[in-house]
Amino acid sequence: MSIMDHSPTTGVVTVIVILIAIAALGALILGCWCYLRLQRISQSEDEESIVGDGETKEPFLLVQYSAKGPCVERKAKLMTPNGPEVHG
């Protein structure tokens, strides 16, 4: 004689509680899956859209390249006076 033998509906209640727990776990997993899927979609859209405050990624890359550009031009200007044309 165990404690659970006193009521015939105890097994039914246990099954219902287990089903509710499985449904809640399934809803949690489904919610996380949908959330991660939406994050991936929004990340791919963010790469093409505005990053913030009216700035996009393309001008940021252009600023990096333009920052390298004057350094190359300065090196070219420094090398030109030292070339054979000045001493020749």
UniProtKB/Swiss-Prot annotation:
The chain crosses the membrane at residues 11-31. Residues 1-10 are mitochondrial intermembrane. Keywords: Membrane, Mitochondrion, Mitochondrion outer membrane, Phosphoprotein, Transmembrane, Transmembrane helix. The keyword Calcium does not apply. GO terms for cellular component: cytoplasm; membrane; mitochondrial outer membrane. GO terms for biological process: response to toxic substance. CDD domains: Stannin. The keyword Membrane applies. GO terms for molecular function: metal ion binding. It is found in: Mitochondrion outer membrane. The modification Phosphoserine is found at S49. InterPro entries: SNN_cytoplasm, SNN_linker, SNN_transmemb, Stannin, Stannin_sf. Residues 32-88 are cytoplasmic. It is a single-pass membrane protein. Monomer. Plays a role in the toxic effects of organotins. Plays a role in endosomal maturation. Belongs to the stannin family. PANTHER family: STANNIN. This is Stannin. It comes from Homo sapiens (Human).
